[in-house]
Amino acid sequence: MPLYTKALEKKWSVRFLKIRKSHIRNLFSIKLLSDYVVISHDLPLKRIKKLGWAGKYIYVEHGLGPMKYYTYKYKFFHEADLLFYPGEVFKRKMEAINPNFKNGLLGGYPKMDDLYHMTINKSALCQKYNLDPSKPIILFAPSWGGKYSKNYGINNLKYLNDVENVIAIPHPADYKIARKMNAIIPKESEGINKFIHLADIIISDISSVLAEACLLDKPVIQIELTTYPGCFPEADKRNEDAWISKTKLDEEANLTKRTKRPFKLPYIDEDWILGHTCKPESLPKTIKLVMDEKGKFSSNRKYWAEQCCWKFDGNISNRMLDMIECFIDKNVPVQLAEIS
């Protein structure tokens, strides 16, 4: 949506479409669909191709978290006419999987322009959410998976029951079960950025919100679990053939030992450690520890902020649109560092 909004500001001829499963409910003619589409998920692409569309597609990643094995696992990533990496670590993942892929460019994450430019009224937000502004504010924003396991996602909120000033924001996939808990379901237009600005400490497992918090140099706590949804060695729930060989996938699964390296990244020999880490039951005491040593992991935060989000400067959408325009004009991906 941020990229679409910025394109409208630039007076581009663009449309934002929801591609429905039933072609009867799609309020457009496939013949009138653009020769170029921008996607952040593969399902809309599959649907328009099934309807007969045969143009070029541009893929924009929808988060900053590099822990999931999904990213670059499937064929549609490797057939993209233009693919944007949110940051250098994503580029390294692709190079490890497919060193011959030539259509990728560093782009950043358009949603982060809002995080960069945002200002908040802390007093008003604290009053609205019944928080004490004189005490540390804790944001708990886990990844999805709560509906699959009591050990995943928003279910770990129970370990914060006795902690003051906690805001819990579930992943959209867990909204249904989160409604039974003391969690906030943001409006679609609201998002999580204002809560990242508001919080003094951000707690998650493997969510993109950890990297987003590091962009603002906010201390984070990563929850250590024996498995994470969508991460090795857990089996893939998607019924889709992988572009990566089964031998390579089996090798990655066997190499991943969460008890020894909880935050080992897939396909590359790196550990995504941005701050303090702990088991869920140790969250209360770790929060106190973080408050006493906020600067301990400042170098980790800076490093992973830069690795996960390229050029966090408030101009990500503008820069990405310049590269899209250049691609349409020249028919080849061209890396641009500055905006026109």
Where are these regions (language model features)?
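A donor-sugar binding/catalytic signature common to diverse glycosyltransferases
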Residues: V37, W53-Y59, K187-E240
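Alpha-helix capping/helix-boundary segments
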Residues: L43-P44, V89-F90, D174, S208-V209, ...
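Short active-site oxyanion
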Residues: S34-Y36, H78-L83, N165-V166, L198-I202, ...
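Active-site and donor-binding regions of nucleotide-sugar-utilizing enzymes
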Residues: M1-T119, G146
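Short acidic-hydrophobic, aromatic-tinged amphipathic segments that line or gate anion-handling sites
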Residues: R15-S22, I184-S189, W272-T286
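C-terminal amphipathic helix plus adjacent low-complexity
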Residues: A235, I244-S340
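Nucleotide-activated donor-binding/catalytic signature segment of Leloir-type glycosyltransferases, i.e.
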Residues: D174-I192
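Conserved catalytic-core segment of nucleotide-activated headgroup transferases in glycan assembly
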Residues: M1, G107-K180, K279, W310-I316
